């Protein structure tokens, strides 16, 4: 993979603007070890109008990480579990964790399509703790091996709300950042690869998988 030195692990581009994230604040761990995006497709990132379904452009509320069934799912930051188990939605089995940032800002990490959970509501969890195993629950039950994934969201409020309302780009909290190679080409994100920005500041081009 092509490397790009001197890119801050706490900076990322999303439609051009570069944002700095305090390394002692929100940026913490990743929800899976050695994270990669499903099929390296930009349409599996967070964004408005980046998916073409049923003849319409659709939003995507989070990141889809490639995760074969039974992959360990990790808490991205210290927090308290506020939801765990079957969600009775397209998300299937899921976990929601509340995090307090800088003593005042509260956000929620959300992990979906799980096969099993290891935590209960009100459990205190630590960054990197195994909280669940990935799976194919909810509307992921018919996915093939290449498409098995963990759906991860960062939210400003708990609960499942349609669209991007209450959703935050996951790059705000994860260690490893992912951005589209060409974010301006909205209607073609399913045919565009990604750029992976590692914790050490190096970046790698990942061409999309057309299989």
Describe the role of every protein-language-model region.
Residues 95-97, 123-197:
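Conserved, short, structured surface segments that act as functional micro-motifs
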Residues 1-3, 17-18, 86-87, 157-160:
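Acidic glycine-/aspartate-rich tracts in secreted/extracellular proteins
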Residues 1-30, 186, 192-201:
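Short turn/helix-capping motifs enriched in Asx and small/polar residues
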Residues 89, 101-107, 159-165:
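Short, solvent-exposed loop/turn segments that connect beta-strands within catalytic domains
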